[in-house]
């Protein structure tokens, strides 16, 4: 058994935690949703984020590979909906290690 003192340390970037989303919401595991359902769920999650003071979140939308025409449905709808909100600063595709094209990272700036 190797001594813990001599085990190789995993290198970390001191800025990694700054870029990590503070919370995530997974549409992908909710089954079939109407646009009204997607909007309601997003609003509930956003309200919770506002209450907790969270400014960076991850929406897991899936890539749409199993949708009717093999095209994403949730991601474009949620992206358009979020961009219509005045407190949304930025919406962009998540990093590869966070789900890539099946996710949206969102930055909020809620009014005081």
Question: What do the predicted segments below correspond to?
Answer:
Residues 1-112:
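Long, charged, low-complexity intrinsically disordered regions
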């Amino acid at each position: 058994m190797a001594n813990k003192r001599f085990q190789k340390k995993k290198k970390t970037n001191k800025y990694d935690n700054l870029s990590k989303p503070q919370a995530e919401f997974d549409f992908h595991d909710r089954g079939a949703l109407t646009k009204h359902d997607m909007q309601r769920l997003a609003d509930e999650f956003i309200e919770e984020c506002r209450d907790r003071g969270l400014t960076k979140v991850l929406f897991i939308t899936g890539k749409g590979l199993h949708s009717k025409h093999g095209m994403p449905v949730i991601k474009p709808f949620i992206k358009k909906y979020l961009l219509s909100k005045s407190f949304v600063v930025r919406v962009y595709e998540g990093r590869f290690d966070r789900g890539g094209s099946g996710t949206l990272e969102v930055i909020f700036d809620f009014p005081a």
